């Protein structure tokens, strides 16, 4: 990947995060730092206490879906720790949905989406945004952001308070 493009993406994430904060929109983004030194070289901030959703599926011994993972790691539905993690999930899902819509980010597979130890999702790898496409194929995704049935299930369905909060954000 071209780290210069990743650096630009990180700067845009920081700008969008500042705009949301100034507008008092409680959507959450993690603007991690990248310093490109050359086309393929540079320094990227490590994002602590995270795992990709893809790695969860492949490496977690009893992984069935995200909702059950949340219950295993944050407590049963209704507990304070679970509800806090779910709120973090909703605010970060909203933040990255806004970001992906504005920047036209594509290639949002589960290897590019991290989950942290507080329930936030964090998107990484911004090789495909605006009309930039390393393989010159930018028409492969039509959705403006990633919202899966599994993400909706973590929010307790489309009729839930959490999903309504996501829509409001």
Residue ranges and their predicted role:
Residues 1-105, 117-133, 138-139:
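Conserved ATP-binding subdomain of kinase catalytic cores across diverse folds
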Residues 108:
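Short, surface-exposed polybasic-aromatic patches that bind anionic ligands, especially phosphate groups
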Residues 111-115:
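Hydrophobic residue at the +6 position relative to the catalytic HRD Asp in the kinase catalytic loop
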Residues 126-169:
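Long, cytosolic, alpha-helical-rich C-terminal regions that act as interaction/scaffolding modules
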């Amino acid at each position: 990947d071209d780290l210069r493009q990743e650096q630009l993406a990180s700067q845009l994430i920081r700008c969008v995060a500042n705009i949301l904060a100034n507008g008092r929109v409680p959507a959450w983004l993690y603007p991690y730092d990248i310093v490109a030194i050359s086309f393929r070289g540079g320094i990227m901030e490590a994002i602590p206490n995270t795992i990709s959703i893809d790695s969860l599926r492949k490496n977690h011994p009893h992984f069935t879906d995200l909702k059950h993972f949340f219950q295993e790691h944050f407590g049963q539905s209704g507990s304070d720790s679970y509800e806090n993690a779910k709120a973090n999930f909703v605010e970060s899902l909203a933040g990255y949905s806004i970001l992906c819509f504005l920047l036209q980010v594509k290639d949002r597979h589960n290897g590019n989406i991290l989950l942290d130890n507080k329930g936030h999702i964090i998107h990484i790898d911004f090789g495909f945004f605006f009309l930039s496409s390393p393989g010159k194929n930018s028409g492969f995704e039509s959705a403006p952001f990633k919202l899966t049935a599994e993400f909706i299930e973590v929010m307790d369905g489309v009729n839930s308070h959490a999903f309504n909060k996501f829509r409001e954000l």
